[in-house]
């Protein structure tokens, strides 16, 4: 009987380890598939993208909300000229999305698979365009959403160090005002998601949670 329980525990431990490794195995398979079967698509995305090492290009990008994020996405898109390298960079970004989602939202081990959802949606959004890639007006579409999502997690990590209500409201105000010109809608995403998460945080007064949530929504609407 004791031996049976020991075998069951070992099997359970092994399955848990394999489950934790599954996202990394999927990432490796994604990189291999893109490098081998997605070469033409990745090269076409790079061919339709534009990035210039020029101050005028950056100034024009800065005039549009989220333009600098787009410029950063366009910069990384250049690496798709070598499909294996561009796919590797994107895979690393997606793994960062997975890992930081777990940490930002304090996802428990039994629900860690949920952290794959944002990365999976980013993959679907990029790889389901088909011929639509020829009519896309955003040459930065391949990398910019992933980078924007990562940036939108910053308020979550900041809230861990800023505990006071007014300190958090001040941070959200600065974040929204300074982040919107650089990140565009992803600055709003960070504000709203952090405000929503604050509603579920234990150890704080209900009035404070709703005040913070309302402040975040008002900042986005204003």
For every predicted segment, state its role.
Residues 101-112, 161-166, 199-210:
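Membrane-interface helix-boundary motifs at transmembrane edges
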Residues 91-108, 151-158:
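Transmembrane-helix motifs of polytopic, lipid-linked glycan transferases
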Residues 161-201, 216-221:
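Transmembrane helices and adjacent periplasmic/lumenal helix-loop junctions
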Residues 31-35, 117-128, 173-184, 215-222:
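Aromatic-anchored segments of alpha-helical transmembrane domains
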Residues 1-31:
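Start-transfer (signal-anchor) and selected internal transmembrane alpha helices
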Residues 19-43, 218-221:
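Transmembrane signal-anchor helices characteristic of membrane glycosylation enzymes that use polyprenol
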Residues 31-88, 93:
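Membrane-interface coil-to-helix junctions
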Residues 44, 62, 66, 110-165, ...:
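Membrane-interface micro-motifs in multi-pass membrane enzymes
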């Amino acid at each position: 009987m004791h031996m049976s329980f020991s075998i069951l525990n070992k099997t359970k431990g092994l399955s848990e380890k394999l489950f934790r490794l599954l996202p990394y195995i999927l990432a490796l398979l994604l990189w291999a598939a893109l490098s081998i079967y997605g070469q033409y698509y990745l090269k076409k995305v790079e061919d339709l993208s534009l990035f210039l090492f020029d101050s005028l290009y950056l100034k024009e990008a800065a005039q549009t909300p989220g333009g600098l994020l787009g410029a950063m996405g366009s910069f990384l898109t250049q690496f798709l000229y070598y499909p294996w390298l561009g796919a590797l960079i994107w895979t690393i970004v997606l793994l960062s999305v997975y890992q930081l989602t777990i940490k930002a939202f304090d996802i428990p081990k039994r629900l860690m698979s949920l952290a794959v959802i944002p990365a999976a949606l980013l993959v679907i959004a990029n790889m389901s365009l088909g011929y639509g890639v020829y009519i896309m007006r955003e040459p930065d579409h391949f990398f910019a959403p992933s980078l924007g999502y990562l940036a939108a997690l910053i308020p979550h990590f900041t809230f861990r160090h800023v505990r006071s209500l007014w300190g958090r409201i001040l941070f959200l105000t600065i974040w929204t005002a300074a982040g919107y010109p650089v990140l565009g809608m992803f600055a709003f995403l960070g504000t709203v998601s952090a405000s929503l998460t604050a509603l579920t945080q234990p150890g704080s007064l209900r009035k404070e949670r709703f005040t913070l949530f309302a402040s975040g929504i008002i900042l986005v609407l204003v």
